Amino acid sequence: QTIYQYVNSHLDEHGRFTATNLCDDRYATIPRPLGSEDAFHYTMGNLPNPKSASVLLKLLQAYLNEPTTQQRSKLYNELKGMAFAEYCDPFIEALDQNDINSVAFDLARRFFYNADGREQVKFALLLFGMYGMEKICQQEPELWQDLLRIAHCEEFTFAFLYSCRVTNFNPQNAIWELIRCTSGWGKVFSITDCHCRDEEERLWLL
């Protein structure tokens, strides 16, 4: 079962993710709170990991130059041991937005819908972010809804919001939707990006 399928099958009628873990971590003795690893890296002042970003960038460029199953598998497997929040900043700083062509977009779509691991899905969100989340929202409404839906699972809320910010897109309707259906780290990150009247309202939402 893919991550996308798993998340969709565990959303209740209010859009809340009802499972406590994901299918790639089903047998963990102590499941980590969803979104906690990225939150730890991004909120504790941990330095980004440019080495990981460089490795991913080289593998992505190798795939874009030669889009074969072998090259795609190398990138897919490398992502397994990574943490999104560790590499996202140096990765987008180093990546030329012109590299996000139709091959990169198709790769992002493939990883998003077919990956059985969370980190590959987050990487797909980042590629979509470089392509332009606002553009996707306007031109690919079905894909946009799928991206927003997976962000209802708090493991992916940060990656979704971060990918919107890559091109300064601040979709308030989507952000308020996420606030209503999250309660942990996903809610914290959504409140950070929402437009509030003042800090008092922001604290009240928390």
Residue ranges with predicted function:
Residues Q1-C137, C153, T157:
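Extended repeat-based scaffolds of very large eukaryotic assembly and lipid-transport proteins
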Residues D12, N65, A104, Y131-E134, ...:
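Generic ordered-secondary-structure signal
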Residues E78, L127, S163-V166, D193:
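Core register positions within helices of long alpha-helical scaffolds
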Residues A83-Y87, A115-F123, E140, A151-A159, ...:
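Generic helix N-cap/helix-start motif at coil->alpha-helix transitions
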Residues N101-F105, Q172, D198:
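Alpha-helix initiation and N-capping motif
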Residues L107-A115, L143-C153, S163, A174-T182, ...:
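Alpha-solenoid HEAT/Armadillo-like helical repeat scaffolds in large eukaryotic proteins
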